[in-house]
């Protein structure tokens, strides 16, 4: 049997906890002493709205934005996300992306 992240089979699609992932993004940003405004400017956004939505667990960043955040925060993109089976959550959130 092939296994990927954790004990999930490699061919199984991972599900991420949107609220816990947002909290992780906020915690890492704060640990790095980076302001929301600095993230906005780095990303080339006109407002902070997207950053606040990600951190509030309203939606996930698009793949290119997730990679840019990871570069800014000096972590891997996977370090910004928390799998659902690692927290007690029953909601599936695929489709919420901004």
Regions from the PLM with identified roles:
Residues 2-15, 71, 81-98:
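Short, charged recognition helix plus adjacent turn
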Residues 23, 33-34, 46, 61-64:
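Residue-level signal for the short linker/turn that defines the boundary of a DNA-recognition helix
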